[in-house]
Amino acid sequence: MSRIFLITAVIILSAACNRPDKPAATANESSTPMMVSFTELKWTELPERKGMQFSVLSGDPKTGAYTQIRKVPAGTDNPLHSHSSEIKNVIVTGVWYTGADVASAKDFGPGSIVVMPGNWLHVSGCRSGSDCVFYQEGNGKFDFMPAAAANPAQ
């Protein structure tokens, strides 16, 4: 994987999300750059989805807004589910798919941007052939709510 591509994707998404309605970075944040190679990232397994890993870059996905790098094994399929907060993804490697159902799911390769509104029921996963790595930004805590839990009336 090209480090330049990963860095470019992070810069583009960060710039796109630097809107006036967001507070400016504190002096400490803006004066201390974060520079880390992909091999230096510290990975944690996602408790809700065995095999998936994440490396937090900023914030805390357990409690609120965050940015992180996600790693998903090739051939992973996520059943119909939702997340309570909006999530933005920039695909770095692999082919990620998502859609309202399996029939309407679209494939997204490196460089693709996928923005999912909070509470949107969808399927997702990583196609066979290559693990998926993507930059992810959430405007609230990360959660994975299977369709039955997300909508008890179903």
What are the functions of these language-model segments?
Residues 2-8:
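Sec-dependent signal peptide recognition
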Residues 13-16:
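C-terminal motif of bacterial Sec signal peptides marking the signal peptidase cleavage site
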Residues 20-66, 106, 149-154:
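A short, N-terminal "cap"/entry segment at the start of jelly-roll beta-barrel domains
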Residues 60-62, 101-119:
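Short acidic-glycine-tyrosine-enriched beta hairpin
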Residues 63-83, 115-119:
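Conserved short histidine dyad/triad with adjacent acidic residue
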Residues 73-76, 83-102:
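Glycine- and acidic-residue-biased ligand/ion/polar-headgroup-sensing regions
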Residues 78-80, 98-99, 121-127:
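Short beta-strand His + acidic residue motifs that chelate non-heme Fe in jelly-roll/DSBH
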